[in-house]
Amino acid sequence: MSDVLERVRKIVIEHLDADPEKVTEKASFIDDLGADSLDNVELVMAFEEEFDIEIPDDAAEHIQTVGDAVKFIQERLGA
C-alpha cells in the first residue's frame, strides 16, 4: 500500500469515524462512508494540510472516492 494511500485512509478513518475495512480505494465518501458535503470540505482541507498542497474547488468537486483523492495527491506531489 502506498504511503499516500495509507495517509489518506488514516485521515478518512479519523474524520468520518469510518470502519477501516470499508475505507478502500473504490469507497465513495458519500455513498459508502456516510460523508456529507461538509465532511467532504473538511476532508479536502485535511488533505491539503497533511500533504502541504492546494486543492482548487473545481478539482475538489471531482474527488469523490478514496482513490480519486490518492490519484490527485500523487499527481500534485509528482509521485
UniProtKB/Swiss-Prot annotation:
Annotated keywords: Cytoplasm, Fatty acid biosynthesis, Fatty acid metabolism, Lipid biosynthesis, Lipid metabolism, Phosphopantetheine, Phosphoprotein
Keyword Cytoplasm tagged: yes
Entry's localization field: Cytoplasm
Any coiled-coil regions, as ranges: none
One cellular-component annotation, GO: cytosol
GO biological process, one term: lipid A biosynthetic process
PTM notes: 4'-phosphopantetheine is transferred from CoA to a specific serine of apo-ACP by AcpS. This modification is essential for activity because fatty acids are bound in thioester linkage to the sulfhydryl of the prosthetic group.
PROSITE patterns: CARRIER
Primary site of residence: cytoplasm
InterPro entries membership: ACP (IPR003231), ACP-like_sf (IPR036736), PP-bd_ACP (IPR009081)
Family as reported in the entry's similarity comment: Belongs to the acyl carrier protein (ACP) family.
Role description: Carrier of the growing fatty acid chain in fatty acid biosynthesis.
Protein name: Acyl carrier protein
